[in-house]
Swiss-Prot record:
GO cellular component entries: apical plasma membrane; dendrite; exocytic vesicle; Golgi apparatus; late endosome; lysosome; melanosome; multivesicular body membrane
Protein name: Ras-related protein Rab-27A
Recorded family membership: Belongs to the small GTPase superfamily. Rab family.
Alphabetically ordered keywords of this record: Acetylation, Disulfide bond, Endosome, Exocytosis, GTP-binding, Hydrolase, Lipoprotein, Lysosome, Membrane, Methylation, Nucleotide-binding, Phosphoprotein, Prenylation
GO molecular-function terms, A-Z: G protein activity; GDP binding; GTP binding; GTPase activity; myosin V binding; protein domain specific binding
Disulfide bridge map: C123-C188
Compartments, record wording: Membrane; Melanosome; Late endosome; Lysosome
A biological-process GO annotation: antigen processing and presentation
Positions bound to GTP: 16-24, 74-78, 133-136, 163-165
Tissue expression from the record: Detected in melanocytes. Expressed abundantly in the stomach and is predominantly localized at the apical region of gastric-surface mucus cells. Also expressed in the thymus and lung.
Name of encoding gene: Rab27a
């Protein structure tokens, strides 16, 4: 796809404590590479990737491909950047929430991150995929898979164990998040409505319509 040759621009935000591997996960997804020497993100950064999304119909048939330009925003996890990070929550349509499988505190802080999303995202029930990262470091694991899955089930969100080092489940997690977003859009009664964080290739957004649809409860917020 050439520049501008897409149906939708969709913004995802990666968030979680500092050091959980947000930058490495996004870099693995967009470039297929792992860099163990990344420095801690300061403020906000982003990466981009073009994909084709094909929805399955009720009869299992694959629908027409939607050309998607993904913007994957990488946020600083440190407390001193928290106000800057939350300012970007409303501009994103989906959230990749990461914790470090070798760091129990980063897992315990997942609840705080979800609370922040519920307060600052485009609605109280945004689309989130939870990722326990660094699954390749099994001998250093501090969080049991059952614990993480139980927490994800409590919030009704998908859970994946990922590794930026070898790429395990990273594409699956982001594809799942994209699928949740596209299905949310399909559920909208007014098909001309596109949520914040989603831009048509003509550059038009619909922030005003978002508030109206949220009040009507049309899109599952």
């Amino acid at each position: 796809m050439s520049d501008g040759d897409y149906d939708y621009l969709i913004k995802f935000l990666a968030l979680g404590d500092s050091g959980v591997g947000k930058t490495s996960v996004l870099y693995q997804y967009t470039d297929g590479k792992f860099n163990s020497k990344f420095i801690t993100t300061v403020g906000i950064d982003f990466r981009e990737k073009r994909v084709v999304y094909r929805a399955n119909g009720p009869d299992g048939a694959v629908g027409r491909g939607q050309r998607i330009h993904l913007q994957l925003w990488d946020t600083a996890g440190q407390e001193r950047f928290r106000s800057l990070t939350t300012a970007f929550f409303r501009d994103a349509m989906g959230f990749l929430l990461l914790f470090d499988l070798t760091n129990e505190q980063s897992f315990l802080n997942v609840r705080n991150w979800i609370s922040q999303l519920q307060m600052h995202a485009y609605c109280e029930n945004p689309d989130i995929v939870l990722c326990g990262n660094k699954s390749d470091l099994e001998d250093q694991r501090a969080v049991k898979e059952e614990e993480a899955r139980e927490l994800a089930e409590k919030y009704g969100i998908p859970y994946f164990e990922t590794s930026a080092a070898n790429g395990t489940n990273i594409s699956h997690a982001i594809e799942m998040l994209l699928d949740l977003i596209m299905k949310r859009m399909e559920r909208c009664v007014d098909k001309s409505w596109i949520p914040e964080g989603v831009v048509r290739s003509n550059g038009h957004t619909s922030a005003d319509q978002l508030s109206e649809e949220k009040e009507k409860g049309l899109c599952g917020c």
